[in-house]
Structures are given as structure tokens and as C-alpha cells.
Amino acid sequence: MKRMNGLELVENLNKVSEEIEAIFNSYKGEELSYVDSIIMDRLETEAHIIKKALEDNGLYGAFLDYIKALEDIQVISDKIEFGVAKFRPAFYTAMELAEDRYRKAKGYLMSKEVLVDL
């Protein structure tokens, strides 16, 4: 058992997801090797354990808010960077709101301690 806060869980879930994606992308539709299939099983089990820990501890909603806020910030940043949002105050207000949602979700995730069997 390992004690982690909710944000550490989210970071671990993101890391596991990236590893799974990298393995899938390396095979491009071919069958996984025996070793990679074992690694994939371990990663999928770890992702399931983390997701279950988030759900069981009431953190899954905050996790979704955190991810959505990050996506919104990225989309708005891209629009501002490429001039789509130039001179449109609504984009800057939307950015402030997304950053506020991000801070709240991150703070909530950081404030909750969880025991996880990883």
C-alpha cells in the first residue's frame, strides 16, 4: 500500500496512459509481442487500480474537472497565440475561468490523501 494525494494519482494515471499509447503506437496494428503483452496487462491493471482509487475516494469528478480545465487552457492559449482571439476580451475571461477551475481541481486533488495498492 502506498499513500498518495489525488494529484499524484492523476500524474501516475497520465504516465501509465502515455506508456500504453507508446506501446500501441509502436505496433501499428500488429500483434503485441509476448513481453509487451505482459507489460500492457500490468499497465492496464495499474490504470484500473488508480481509476478505482479516484472513484472510491470521491476524486474522479475532480480528476475530470482537472483534465477538462487543462484542455480548455490549451485550446484558448492556441487561439490567443495564433491571433484568433486578438482583441476579444471574452477569450481572456474564458482563460481566467479555466485557470481558476484548474487551480481549484488541483488544490482539491492535492488535499486528499489516498491509500493505493500499486
Task: List PLM regions with ranges.
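Non-transmembrane amphipathic alpha-helical segments
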Residues: 16-23, 50, 69, 76
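Short, solvent-exposed, charged loop/turn and helix-capping segments
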Residues: 46-65
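Small side chains
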Residues: 6, 47, 51-53, 77, ...
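Short, charged, amphipathic alpha-helical segments
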Residues: 33-45, 63-67, 88-97
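Charged, low-complexity interaction regions
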Residues: 24-37, 59-60, 79-91
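Short terminal alpha-helical segments
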Residues: 1-44
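Amphipathic alpha-helical binding modules
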Residues: 70-118
